[in-house]
């Protein structure tokens, strides 16, 4: 599988191409393969050191590129690797089933939970079917329906956020995009069950926030969370989308910066090179975090849970 190396990863890509070429020779080169083992080992060490060096000092723009990586695990990947017995639930019971939002009931180590998340799609057909992970009002109303169901059956809610933003089309606006988002914010803030939100890729504006109000808000190490994309910000402030790297730095959209501002609770570590390099390892890190946080929240009664969430929301903007 091609890893789709990003621009800043070119030195790593060149090294790994050399390693793969040597492995190919080793596999088909007969007796000469013995002489290549040491060289392959040296190149692998060099590649590891280079990865550590590059990924220890990523800027906001490089992080934004990683957050959008096409091979990054999406909601259904986490469903596959973290949960058991997933049953997808569809439709908002009012207009349509928006494929940009997926949700359903599953088990986490035997514990029933409700899962809701954005789903982007990888191949062209799937991307179009999922509307590139940009939900319409019916998507957010589906999410709301599942949240209310979870509350009725006393199931914790776990959300996975990965969207460039809510879909800005005319039809979406006519069907009440802003109302759907606003209602989700209102309802989520008062739910009587634990809610854990995870930004796993792009956290784009209200489209992300509509499933992002919770008792814990986590971000993956190389995810982003912001009111607008770096390109959009650059176009507004400098009339030049090419200034996106400068905009990304100014926006403070990375997990460490948002943790510093106390807008998120925890940063979930990614495998070296990003979550796309090892879906299973990333899922293990996610699962460990969810289990620990759920255990913490399950110690609270309904009133304490809601009060804790209310205080958390009221403290936004104070550092």
From Swiss-Prot:
InterPro entries per the UniProt record, alphabetical: Acetyl_CoA_COase_a_su, ClpP/crotonase-like_dom_sf, COA_CT_C
Domain CoA carboxyltransferase C-terminal: 35-296
Primary enzyme class: transferase
One MF term in the entry's GO annotations: acetyl-CoA carboxylase activity
PROSITE patterns reported for this sequence: COA_CT_CTER
GO cellular component term of the entry, any: acetyl-CoA carboxylase complex
Pathway: Lipid metabolism; malonyl-CoA biosynthesis; malonyl-CoA from acetyl-CoA: step 1/1
EC number: 2.1.3.15
Pfam families (UniProt xref): ACCA (PF03255)
Domain of life: Bacteria
Biological processes, Gene Ontology terms: fatty acid biosynthetic process; malonyl-CoA biosynthetic process
Disulfide bond residue pairs: none
Localization in the cell: Cytoplasm
Subunit structure: Acetyl-CoA carboxylase is a heterohexamer composed of biotin carboxyl carrier protein (AccB), biotin carboxylase (AccC) and two subunits each of ACCase subunit alpha (AccA) and ACCase subunit beta (AccD).
HAMAP family per record: AcetylCoA_CT_alpha (MF_00823)
Family: Belongs to the AccA family.
Its job: Component of the acetyl coenzyme A carboxylase (ACC) complex. First, biotin carboxylase catalyzes the carboxylation of biotin on its carrier protein (BCCP) and then the CO(2) group is transferred by the carboxyltransferase to acetyl-CoA to form malonyl-CoA.
Full protein name: Acetyl-coenzyme A carboxylase carboxyl transferase subunit alpha
Gene this protein is translated from: accA
């Amino acid at each position: 599988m091609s890893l789709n190396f990003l621009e800043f990863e070119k030195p790593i890509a060149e090294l790994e191409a050399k390693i793969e070429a040597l492995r190919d020779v080793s596999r088909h080169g007969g007796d000469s393969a013995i002489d290549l083992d040491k060289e392959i080992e040296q190149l692998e060490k060099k590649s590891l050191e280079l990865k550590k060096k590059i990924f220890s000092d990523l800027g906001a723009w490089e992080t934004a590129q990683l957050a959008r990586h096409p091979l990054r695990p999406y909601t259904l990947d986490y469903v596959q690797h973290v949960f058991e017995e997933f049953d997808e639930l569809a439709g908002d019971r009012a207009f349509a089933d928006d494929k940009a939002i997926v949700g359903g009931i599953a088990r986490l180590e035997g514990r029933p939970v409700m899962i809701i998340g954005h789903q982007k799609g990888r191949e062209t057909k799937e991307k179009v079917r999922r509307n590139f992970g940009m939900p319409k009002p019916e998507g957010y109303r589906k999410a709301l329906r599942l949240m209310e169901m979870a509350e009725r059956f006393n199931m914790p809610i776990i959300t996975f956020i990965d969207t460039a933003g809510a879909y800005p089309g005319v039809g979406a606006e006519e069907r009440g995009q802003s109302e759907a988002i606003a209602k989700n914010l209102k309802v989520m803030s008062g739910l009587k069950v634990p809610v854990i939100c995870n930004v796993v890729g792009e956290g784009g504006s209200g489209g992300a926030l509509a499933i992002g109000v919770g008792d814990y808000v986590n971000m993956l190490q190389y995810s982003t969370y912001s009111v607008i994309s770096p390109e959009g910000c650059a176009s507004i402030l400098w009339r030049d989308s090419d200034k996106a790297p400068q905009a990304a730095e100014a926006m403070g959209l990375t997990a460490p910066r948002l943790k510093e501002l106390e807008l998120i609770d925890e940063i979930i570590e990614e495998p070296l090179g990003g979550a796309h390099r090892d879906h299973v390892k990333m899922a293990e890190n996610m699962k460990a975090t969810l289990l620990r946080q759920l255990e913490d929240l399950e110690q609270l009664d309904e009133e304490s849970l809601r009060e804790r969430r209310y205080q958390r929301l009221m403290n936004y903007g104070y550092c």
